[in-house]
């Protein structure tokens, strides 16, 4: 999505918000109700199952390209774990599409008046910009 303010009653152009015929956000292939407010993101898609195997139950299992999503219950709390793949481009897609899932009305193609804040936790490794930091 473009980095600009959109009035909540102004329709978002189809080129800026790609929703499939099934009503799912394009890259993640998810419906708005498929995610929890608490989300763990990992780079490697194999880590999704390693984490969700500890869930008490899994209600959503979706895979599209490098994006694997499991949503379920853990100790009475609804959680989503989602793989981003590699690179900042993929993370940008994931974060923008997660935001769209909770803050855009998919029927009207407008932003919701009340916004939902997601709790996103990154689990994994990252490189360093300084050679002396491993």
Identify the role of each PLM range.
Residues 2-134:
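Metabolite-binding pocket within alpha/beta catalytic cores that recognizes anionic/polar moieties
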């Amino acid at each position: 999505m473009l980095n600009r303010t959109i009035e909540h009653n102004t329709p978002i152009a189809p080129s800026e918000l790609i929703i499939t015929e099934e009503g799912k956000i394009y890259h993640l292939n998810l419906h708005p109700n498929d995610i929890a407010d608490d989300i763990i993101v990992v780079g490697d898609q194999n880590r999704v199952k390693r984490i969700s195997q500890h869930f008490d139950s899994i209600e959503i299992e979706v895979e599209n390209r490098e994006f694997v999503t499991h949503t379920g219950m853990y100790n009475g709390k609804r959680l989503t774990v989602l793989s981003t793949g590699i690179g900042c481009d993929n993370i940008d897609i994931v974060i923008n599409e997660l935001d769209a899932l909770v803050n855009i009305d998919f029927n009207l193609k407008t932003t919701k008046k009340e916004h939902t804040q997601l709790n996103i936790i990154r689990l994994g490794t990252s490189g360093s910009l300084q050679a002396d930091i491993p």
